[in-house]
Amino acid sequence: MPPVSEVDRGPVEESSGGLKRSDCVCPVCLEIFLEPVTLPCMHTFCKPCFLETVDKSNMCCPLCRKRVSTWARLNSRNKTLVNMELWRRIQDAFPSQCERRVQGIDDDEEAVMIPKPRVCQPGELRKEYEDQISKLVEEKRALEEAERRASEEYIQRLLAEEEERLEEERRRREEQQLENDEKLARLLSLELNSGPASESTCNIKPAEATPAKKKPSVGDIEKFLRPVPHRQPSSSDSSPDSSLMANKENILSPPKPLSALSAEDCGKLTVHMLECNGKPSTSSFNPSTSEHTFVFNTPKSSSVKRKSSEIELQSEVDLHSKRPCALLRFDSSSEDSPFLSEVAVHEEALRSRWQQEEEDRRLALRIQKELDRENSVDRRKGSADSYQLRQKNTSVSTTTSPDVEGTKKGSNTTTAKNCTGRRGEEKTEKRLSGTTPGKRPGVKTPVSSTAVSSTVKKGTKQTTLTEMFPNMGS
């Protein structure tokens, strides 16, 4: 058996001009070209096939669907549709086939155009398979690398955003803390400068004042925020100092009005923390007392020299670390004792009044609970306020009058009288039940209705017809 590569299923004709039969076959009719027409898209058809498929239908190439309407109309008018050069070459290469095609004679032998099969070389399939596998692995590796890189970038971006957010929150908290510290320092300075000095603070002028446009140094606010260790009160500490430290939380309490102080007290006021422009004092922070000169524009004197005691501040923690609210201690002169003592007395009075109001409120709540407990009504059976129920039939039968017993004995003798009596009683009861609820206050009630009301007022829950109508028994 010959090898597969040597099998030849049909002849393959090739002319001397270099044209193959496969190149001269129309893709529509699968015959050799007859007056070939070459379109602008370089696809060639027979002229009859072109006229049937292109010219009469949609004016598009059957293979590539390119629009050729303008080209077809122009060449049809000029009669240049047929590619004469290709037609001449086909006639020179295949004269017999062209002659039979022109005469309309079909070819007896059909040329089978099957290419010769080719056997693969040893290892060619394995190499092709390995190349395909390596290509797929490389593509997968590249895809995984791209995904990993994208995930790393995304994680880095998330971490950066989180870090920025935390940094922003920390910066915001620090700014808020600084604002709170600054507000607290201002409140402390206003508390110390308020009261008697409310009118004169704006007129205070230091003797050795710096220029007005001098900017405050950065970080001066820290000296008002340093915590001071608790010390045992000594003889030098006066009672107003201790009262002010005990009531440091009541900073926002209304200050004493200026009208309560005299002009002499205003002149003797000493400024402890800040100057009139709100800037911290430029004096050093040593325990010793330094002398400052201030000008007070009071009604009595225009300029008076006063001594002010320096603020004693001691820090035990780092300035950059977080710390609680600063505790300020200072040595006040004897001239401040009336004002501070009055403030302490006023706060003590307010506290005592609040305690008394709280005790009164608790007492009122306790009394109200006792009253609610006393006013509650017990409706259980057997209690004093229980619901009044109807009495049993046995009690009703025992309370009947002798007239009723005589009537019952007479009724038992004759059946006819008993029936008529019962019917009369039923009619009377129905008439009574129909007329009693609808009676009007202006109409006089009979004696029987008065008897019924009297029996109801006595407290009985059920009565008989003879008690309601005593005239019937007689």
Swiss-Prot record:
InterPro entries with a match to the protein in the record: RNF168, RNF168/RNF169_E3_ubiq-ligase, Znf_RING, Znf_RING/FYVE/PHD
Biased composition (Basic and acidic residues): 1-12, 367-383, 422-432
Keywords in alphabetical order: Chromatin regulator, DNA damage, DNA repair, Metal-binding, Nucleus, Transferase, Ubl conjugation pathway, Zinc, Zinc-finger
Compositionally biased spans, kind Polar residues: 192-203, 385-402, 409-418
A GO term, aspect molecular function: ubiquitin-protein transferase activity
Region (Disordered): 1-20, 192-259, 367-474
Source domain of life: Eukaryota
Chain ranges of zinc fingers (RING-type): 26-65
One GO cellular component term noted in the UniProt record for this chain: nucleus
EC number: 2.3.2.27
Record-linked PROSITE patterns: ZF_RING_2
Span(s) of short sequence motif LR motif 2: 379-390
Residue ranges of the motif LR motif 1: 119-137
Cellular compartment(s): Nucleus
A biological process from GO: protein K63-linked ubiquitination
Chain span(s) of sequence motif MIU motif 2: 353-376
Stretches of the chain forming a coiled coil according to its record: none
Function noted in UniProt: E3 ubiquitin-protein ligase required for accumulation of repair proteins to sites of DNA damage. Acts with ube2n/ubc13 to amplify the rnf8-dependent histone ubiquitination. Recruited to sites of DNA damage at double-strand breaks (DSBs) by binding to ubiquitinated histone H2A and ubiquitinates histone H2A and H2AX, leading to amplify the rnf8-dependent H2A ubiquitination and promoting the formation of 'Lys-63'-linked ubiquitin conjugates. This leads to concentrate ubiquitinated histones H2A and H2AX at DNA lesions.
Protein name: E3 ubiquitin-protein ligase rnf168
